[in-house]
Each structure stands twice: as structure tokens, then as C-alpha cells.
């Protein structure tokens, strides 16, 4: 209890004082990206941008109460920020977090321990998982979505063969909050 009182007042105020509701058009985040141009820029995303993107993804995949998302994508990237931070929070989907997406040994252990059902990552991360995660650790995973870079056919084939789940590809950019389109299962 003493540690609670040691917190700075601005943290206590933020945690316990009600804030005025935010308008959907207000800025929710500024995500920095160099995108395809190579020129760094800050992309302003509104609450409406994020909400629409999250609702669209949730509508496509229709998450179930027993689903668990592995959140290993960095929050400074729009893919991680939207689908591994905010999507679970908004949809009520459970999430398991790990700070290093290339720590495949720990990722595999977390997937098995928490029976993760949804894995989101880049093709680079999926390639690392192919090398270092055992098939038994991935038994609970029923949905894999890759984004942020091109998903090569050989990675899809190797992942499907080793783990018995076919990665789906998403496309987007930071300016789109970030998901523009995604493959859907069973099509």
C-alpha cells in the first residue's frame, strides 16, 4: 500500500480521474514510419481510424471467447499497435505478450503454456519460428496472420507442413491503421 502512495500525482490522476470522452475524429496516436518512401514521417491516426480497423478485423475473423492472441509485435509499429495491443483490449480477446518477437524459444514455450490460438507476425518472425519451435508447441494455434512484408510461398508451405496451420497474408500501411486487406480462412 505504501508503494501506491509513492506514485506521482499525475499517474494517480490519470488512473483514477474520469476523462472527458474523446471524439472519434480526435488523434489517438502518432505512429512514426519511413514506409516505402524511406522518408521518416509521423502518421496521425484518429480514434475512428483505429476503431474501424479493429472492428473490420474482428468481423472477418470472428474471435471466440477461448481465443488467445500472442502479442510479440512491437507497439511502435502500426501492425503491433493495432492488432496486438488494441484489438485484444477492444474485443475482450485474451492476449499473451512477449517483448522480443525473435526469441523463438520463449515464443514457442508461451504458445504451448497458454494455448495460444492466434499468432500474428511478420514473415521474418515466422521464418525464425520455423527454425526454432517444435510442432507440438504450436498445436493450439489455429490462425496465423502475417503482415508488414511480403509472405513468400515457400514460408507458407513450410509453415503449413511443419505446424499444420497455413499462414494468411495481410496487406496495409501505417496510414490505413494498418490493415487494408487480409486473406480469409477456408477460401
Model-derived segments and spans:
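Conserved pre-ATP/AMP-binding loop-to-beta segment of ANL
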Residues: 2-32, 39, 62-68
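Conserved S/T- and glycine-rich ATP-binding loop of Class I adenylate-forming
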Residues: 27, 33-36, 69, 75, ...
Amino acid at each position: 500500500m505504501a508503494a501506491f502512495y509513492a506514485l506521482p500525482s499525475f499517474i494517480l490522476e490519470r488512473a483514477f480521474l474520469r476523462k472527458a470522452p474523446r471524439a472519434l475524429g480526435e488523434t489517438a496516436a502518432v505512429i512514426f514510419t519511413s514506409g516505402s518512401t524511406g522518408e521518416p514521417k509521423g502518421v496521425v491516426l484518429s480514434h475512428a481510424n483505429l476503431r474501424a480497423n479493429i472492428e473490420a478485423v474482428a468481423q472477418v475473423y470472428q474471435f471466440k471467447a477461448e481465443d488467445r492472441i500472442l502479442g510479440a509485435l512491437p507497439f511502435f509499429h502500426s501492425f503491433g499497435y493495432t492488432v496486438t495491443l488494441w484489438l485484444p483490449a477492444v474485443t475482450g480477446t485474451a492476449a499473451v505478450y512477449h517483448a522480443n518477437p525473435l526469441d523463438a524459444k520463449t515464443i514457442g514455450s508461451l504458445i504451448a503454456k497458454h494455448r495460444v490460438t492466434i499468432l500474428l507476425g511478420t514473415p521474418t518472425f515466422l521464418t525464425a519460428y520455423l527454425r526454432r519451435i517444435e510442432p507440438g508447441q504450436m498445436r493450439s494455434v489455429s490462425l496465423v496472420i502475417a503482415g508488414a512484408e511480403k509472405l513468400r510461398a515457400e514460408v507458407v508451405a513450410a509453415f503449413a507442413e511443419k505446424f499444420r496451420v497455413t499462414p494468411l497474408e495481410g496487406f496495409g500501411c501505417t496510414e490505413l491503421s494498418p490493415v487494408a486487406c487480409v486473406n480469409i480462412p477456408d477460401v
